[in-house]
């Protein structure tokens, strides 16, 4: 039995119905987990002596606009004892109703969830530390969302340099 098969067997026996589906891509297994069961799954993966996923290496989020559910939250786990990586994916329909915080399982999750909220706007229930981490406190919106308005400065070339130069706010004496 492979390690991936062992993970699925343990999850299926201990938490029936928690796993929605699985996918393999480039040698990495992704397990799609129900949002209401993800905390139980994470605790089991960490505490089971055969699995020992003791390291949460990252939490990320994807925006699938215009698809529904729009957001996916990804938990990247590492079992150092078994030298094995695993990704859990949770679908999130409403970013204000995201999954529960994992901070009581892995303390680093507080910061990782803060990053996901700052850039993508997905809230984690029970995380009282959600605040701006990378962006200024007065920033409006979440810039990694697909519907975030793009802003840019026009590139200056030889054919348009006078037009661009005239728009720049140079210091006045």
Report the location of each language-model feature:
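Terminal low-complexity/charged segments
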Residues: 1-173
